[in-house]
Amino acid sequence: MGNSLRYLGRIEEADQRFAQALKLKPDYFNAYRNRGTLHAWTGRIDLALKYYADAMRLHPQDAELHRNLGVISLLQGNFDIGWKEYRYRWQCTDASQPRYSQPKWTGQDLQGKTILLYAEQGLGDTLHFVRFAKILQIAGARTIVHCQASLAAILQGCEGISSLVPNTWKVPDHFDYHCSLMDVADVMQIDLSNIPGETPYIKSPPNLVAYWKRQLNQLLPPAKHRIGIVWQGNPNHQADMFRSFPLESLEPLCNIDDVQLISLQFGKGSEQIKSWKGSKPIYQLPDDLDQSSGAFMDTAAILHHLDWIVTSDTSLAHLAGALARPTVVMLGFTPDWRWLLDRPDTPWYPTMHLIRQTTIGQWHSVAQQVADFLTTKLQPAT
């Protein structure tokens, strides 16, 4: 019951349920672990660590518990501990590590070798960590990237990939080592001092960028500044309630002078445009966007013609960052680990600005800060 309430966002009720369960059964491992996760989600890190420690005393080898502790350490910027604990994710029931006859790469010399790099988790994770292919290629490796089929087109423009294989295709047999893209960061002992933050590492075809310059000028009225907006991420993500926000939250953006708001939202969430009451219209792009050229291809080209992108924590945020486009990410009270804590920037993407929620569930004030920030950035130089 506590977990069900957590997924519904009924935080205090969930905590009470866990407390009741522990009162009845003081050695209830799942209650300790899930109570810790509840507090981790809501930013009460000290409480989360307390309940995780209680759970650890009962089951010191629990994989999910170690994974969760890894996430907290990464969020806090303690990458040395974080990567080690996060390795336990492969032992969790919701993760499956591919099995190959070739050895896993754990730091062996790659000069003249071929390494298979495979995606794990979501599209945003792949866009985020595919940067490491270039580093391994520079180290002498031939890199094969096995990625989600929907990313195959856009990753054709990614530096450092020798060969790209969609995950709907059979993996080639001829490689020397394998490693997940995310585990490369672990093997390389990436921390805050050596994050490879050079962008862009994904590039759009120049002809497609030129095409969309012409198209936007035909489809949209003239505008001094164009801002692309995204508000809804994957509704099936377990943390979606803390990441996505209603479109109406973005009304403060209408107070920015001489801006045009362009929706980059497709599928779930786009229906909210019908009930938009902001003082500036939201312009929508053609429904067949990305259909002929491949997922993200048209979108990426369009990003080159926007002054700023304002987005929730979605795969598009990673795409914009990888393209080195000026981007503001609106983050929930406790963000995903890669955004760290208490800073307005990210070492992963130098063209990105982070604005963080200060109260769970309140997005209007975040959007107001975005509007103030963009007003400063877009005002004429004096």
Located regions from the model:
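Alpha-helical solenoid repeat scaffolds of the TPR/TPR-like class and their adjacent stem/linker regions
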Residues: M1-T382
